[in-house]
């Protein structure tokens, strides 16, 4: 049955949701359209019961942009889509993070959601449409999922909010915020902003939530018309006798441990010991009490002998103890108050060959960030359905397994690393100088050496410090902090600078980065329903205080960017040449520019407007390259010395030398040496590179052509005079 629904969100943003036409063998499918951008989402959930020991929800979200959607060919030899791009991975994470908390607790069926962009108008990003399509596909399926989710993008132009702005509108906007939520609450937030205030952020969220409510209502209408019954689902629940026994035998020890401030590793060891001891006691207790007859009469009693179920019960007690400690006593696992930030230490310039470096340590989280400066050719080429550009600022985040004391795979960046790096990059991008002010390509690499929460925000702080250490004139320093939440009924506590355990056992992970004057990036994930705006307001204000405290500590280490770039960084010199002289500098097949590079060691880039950028770590080599290029594009002047190439030899006349591109002059036989020579070929041969001096310029009265007279002998006389006077001879290329 084909059903189609439509909603107008204003400003010409009309969204259509349809189902029943495409991918009908999937458990659920939906197509969402806005203008000429169309997204197909499908969902399939396994009907095979999960393993009794499974304790996680295996949800896989894949987002793919088909090049054919925009009438483009994929790049590369094979001309077909390959592994997911960074943009596709980030879009998949955006949708995954909003959907995952909305599945019912205990639903562990393997589930796969595939979102395919099947048409693109190249100006509307399909990521938020993919979130709507995925939710609609689940709503019309038989998969348990009570509340629809919608995603929108919010921008602001001249003080007016706009929903789902296209790329042209985003270019004028001072914010780009993706919001995911249900009719009742916000469950996901991510975006970048140009130093907006906390109040402005809250207004943007409220504006986006109004649109989300309308789209969610439309999904409910769609699902009601499909009227597909949901498959029966009963979450596995531990027997009361098991829950009570476990709590009785581990609650006191876990509480005593929670109230004792310990390092991460020591706490983990002591917690593991309590788990092991409690499991042993529980198995001993129930082995004699739960036999085959009882299991046959009550199959759930078998859970009393299941180690995995016992672990789940202990974990529930651990979570309860920590949450009550925070809510009742305002104390945290490491002894801090709710708003207190962990101790911070900063070391700059510790990597000698890097162009800038910083070691940022906050508590037991440590990031080593290094800076590399490059030229325009080092920029990353980005090719998506809505964008085709060179990216000149990038931040890469690495999270090796040793940072949490584990053994693991070492290879390419995973989805989490790409997501964390992107967040830190967006935070710092807003304060980067313009290309005209700082024409370098910039790469920051954050290697997490230790982790106990907030490693992405440590990357923001470390990245800012490394950039300042490397002499990048940032508009303002940026810091970041991760906020947490513990909420039970009407009681709640907002935590500043959360630990890993507080993230794992808490209800929110809200990362906020910005300058003293406003927010530049944020990311929020919520695990509960019912987050109200008052809690968000509290979290934003508390994050502002923490951010300012961190900026104060950073300012003590380095108050402002260094006056100069690192000594090993390439020096960029920019000169302007006439557009019609570009070919002259490049030469036939790149011969001229290649020879300049080989002789000076400088890297040279020429833009179509005649802007020449010369990169070299040696000032002398840079000067030589600049002089050579200026000489190439200048008009020939008598008395100037050039490096030329012998093109032709006439034994009784002289040698024709190309001393400028496509410009030849004659070195008469009498101007080759001080002594008389019989034949030019005795001294020179075609292809020789020689220094010559321009001694005369005149027009041929018969042809009107300009002729140039060159001399080698004049240079020999000059060299002899310089040696007599103890002067250095001039060198010009």
From Swiss-Prot:
GO-annotated molecular function: 3'-5'-RNA exonuclease activity; magnesium ion binding; polyribonucleotide nucleotidyltransferase activity; RNA binding
The keyword Calcium belongs to this UniProt entry's keyword annotation: no
Pfam family name, one: KH_1
S1 motif domain: residues covered: 639-713
One GO BP: mRNA catabolic process
Top class in the EC scheme: transferase
GO cellular component: cytosol
Family the entry assigns: Belongs to the polyribonucleotide nucleotidyltransferase family.
Binding site for Mg(2+): 503, 509
PANTHER family linked: POLYRIBONUCLEOTIDE NUCLEOTIDYLTRANSFERASE, POLYRIBONUCLEOTIDE NUCLEOTIDYLTRANSFERASE 1, MITOCHONDRIAL
Its job: Involved in mRNA degradation. Catalyzes the phosphorolysis of single-stranded polyribonucleotides processively in the 3'- to 5'-direction.
Record-listed E.C. numbers: 2.7.7.8
Domain of life of the native organism: Bacteria
Record domain KH: where: 570-629
CDD domains recorded: KH-I_PNPase (cd02393), RNase_PH_PNPase_1 (cd11363), RNase_PH_PNPase_2 (cd11364), S1_PNPase (cd04472)
Protein name according to UniProt: Polyribonucleotide nucleotidyltransferase
InterPro entries noted in UniProt: ExoRNase_PH_dom1 (IPR001247), ExoRNase_PH_dom2 (IPR015847), ExoRNase_PH_dom2_sf (IPR036345), KH_dom (IPR004087), KH_dom_type_1 (IPR004088), KH_dom_type_1_sf (IPR036612), NA-bd_OB-fold (IPR012340), PNPase (IPR012162)
Keywords: Cytoplasm, Magnesium, Metal-binding, Nucleotidyltransferase, RNA-binding, Transferase
Catalytic activity: RNA(n+1) + phosphate = RNA(n) + a ribonucleoside 5'-diphosphate
Localization in the cell: Cytoplasm
Cofactor(s) it depends on: Mg(2+)
